[in-house]
């Protein structure tokens, strides 16, 4: 009974908020106001952050008010910084959001938020697609929705976007189909990857390792798997089953390597690494995955789009995919021949992963990896943020 009353109350509140938002949205735009958001306000990261940082660095040319929209549970990320922020769905947020000239976000906004007519909505998205997305998915296995409803809601939200940032021509064609997007693409490469092409990379790497308390004399392996649509606790909270044998990795690699874990932001697990102290570290809550890319010598992943970003560093990538047949045939499916074209070996056991790690000592880019780089990373030259800002603001 209580839950039904609560649901009705929330539904009424959302309706009222939406009406008020719509009314405020009729007022003139604040032409100098840009609202940023990353992963529904959970992070200060990704493409919105890179665009924000570029604008901050070029204040003389771009005199704008820059404000972040954040989830109240994550305000500690901003409390110790000079970044201006508003708590998502607060009354002040509602006013600023409804009157801002620009929205810059990397994931979908709630459907109940109406986009004012003269607001420019910039969708940066957050990855080069390997697994099928939105309208291209044959079947949706996520909690709290059906395939038809998921696609309908996704496309309704995508219809509000004015600009969509694409990392390459491959992604542009897929986004056009998956999101049914018919407005303006900015095919610029991903702004977030500008960080990986800084001139002072070695100096930056040392600073990051020192700040994170990581041994500077050991090589770093980054393990960054994705989530599984059909393995969840509730809507937006996904399970992760650690199949990779950390004990074996520690026993055979600890003298030379450190392992960093970075779970997907939708995964709810807290991985207990007590037994693997000084070998394995959980940096899932680390706000900026770009820093983890930069300090890592090797990436281990599965079907996560992180490998497209990491490939720009031209370092070894290993794919730990014990469930590849099920994932390919029953969950998402892939846009291209992953098994043939992946820029690294596909491995199904921890033993094979360890063997492959040892082989990276003689790592050389073969024709397959060079071809992959030329298809997916050719726009990543450190100037993507500049391209986006010039397209939007001149």
Swiss-Prot record:
It is a peripheral membrane protein. One of its GO terms (molecular function) is CDP-glycerol glycerophosphotransferase activity. The keyword Transferase applies. It is found in: Cell membrane. Its main location: membrane. GO terms for biological process: teichoic acid biosynthetic process. Disruption phenotype: No effect. Keywords: Cell membrane, Membrane, Teichoic acid biosynthesis, Transferase. It is an enzyme of class 2 (transferase). Induction: The gene is not expressed under normal growth conditions. InterPro entries: Glycerophosphate_synth (IPR007554), TagF_C (IPR043148), TagF_N (IPR043149), Teichoic_Acid_Biosynth (IPR051612). It catalyses: 4-O-[(2R)-glycerylphospho]-N-acetyl-beta-D-mannosaminyl-(1->4)-N-acetyl-alpha-D-glucosaminyl di-trans,octa-cis-undecaprenyl diphosphate + n CDP-glycerol = 4-O-{[(2R)-1-glycerylphospho](n)-(2R)-1-glycerylphospho}-N-acetyl-beta-D-mannosaminyl-(1->4)-N-acetyl-alpha-D-glucosaminyl undecaprenyl diphosphate + n CMP + n H(+). Pfam families: Glyphos_transf. The keyword Lipid biosynthesis does not apply. Its EC number is 2.7.8.12. One of its GO terms (cellular component) is plasma membrane. Belongs to the CDP-glycerol glycerophosphotransferase family. Catalyzes the addition of further 2-8 glycerol phosphate units from CDP-glycerol to the single glycerol phosphate unit bound to the prenolpyrophosphate-linked disaccharide. The function in the cell is unknown since the product is not part of the poly(ribitol phosphate) teichoic acid found in the cell walls. This is Teichoic acid poly(glycerol phosphate) polymerase. It comes from Bacillus spizizenii (strain ATCC 23059 / NRRL B-14472 / W23).
């Amino acid at each position: 009974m209580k839950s039904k009353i609560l649901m009705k109350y929330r539904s009424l509140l959302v309706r009222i908020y939406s009406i008020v938002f719509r009314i405020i949205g009729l007022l003139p735009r604040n032409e100098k106001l840009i609202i940023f958001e990353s992963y529904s306000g959970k992070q200060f990261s990704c493409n919105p952050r890179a665009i924000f940082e570029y604008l901050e660095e070029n204040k003389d040319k771009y005199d704008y008010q820059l404000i972040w929209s954040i989830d109240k549970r994550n305000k500690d990320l901003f409390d110790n910084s000079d970044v201006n922020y508003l708590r998502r769905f607060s009354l002040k947020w509602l006013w600023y959001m409804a009157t801002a000239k620009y929205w810059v976000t990397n994931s979908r906004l709630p459907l109940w938020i109406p986009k004012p007519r003269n607001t420019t909505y910039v969708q940066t998205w957050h990855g080069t697609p390997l697994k099928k997305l939105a309208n291209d998915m044959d079947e949706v296995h996520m909690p709290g929705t059906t395939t038809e409803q998921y696609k309908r809601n996704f496309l309704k939200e995508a219809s509000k976007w004015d600009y969509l940032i694409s990392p390459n021509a491959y992604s542009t064609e897929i986004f056009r189909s998956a999101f049914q997007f018919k407005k303006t693409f900015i095919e610029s490469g991903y702004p977030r990857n500008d960080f990986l092409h800084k001139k002072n990379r070695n100096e930056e790497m040392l600073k990051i390792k020192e700040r994170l308390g990581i041994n500077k004399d050991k090589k770093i392996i980054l393990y960054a798997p994705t989530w599984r649509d059909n393995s969840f606790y509730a809507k937006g909270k996904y399970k992760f089953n650690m199949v990779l044998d950390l004990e074996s990795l520690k026993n055979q690699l600890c003298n030379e390597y450190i392992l960093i874990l970075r779970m997907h932001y939708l995964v709810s697990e807290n991985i207990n690494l007590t037994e693997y102290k000084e070998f394995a570290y959980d940096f899932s809550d680390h706000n900026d995955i770009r820093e983890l890319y930069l300090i890592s010598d090797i990436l281990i992943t599965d079907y996560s789009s992180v490998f497209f970003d990491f490939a720009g560093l031209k370092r070894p990538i290993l794919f730990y995919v014990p469930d590849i047949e099920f994932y390919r045939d029953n969950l998402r499916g892939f846009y291209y021949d992953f098994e043939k074209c992946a820029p690294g070996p596909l491995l199904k056991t921890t033993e094979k992963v360890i063997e492959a790690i040892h082989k990276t000592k003689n790592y050389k880019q073969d024709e397959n990896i060079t071809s992959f780089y030329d298809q997916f990373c050719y726009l990543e030259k450190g100037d993507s943020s500049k391209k986006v800002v010039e397209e939007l603001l001149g």
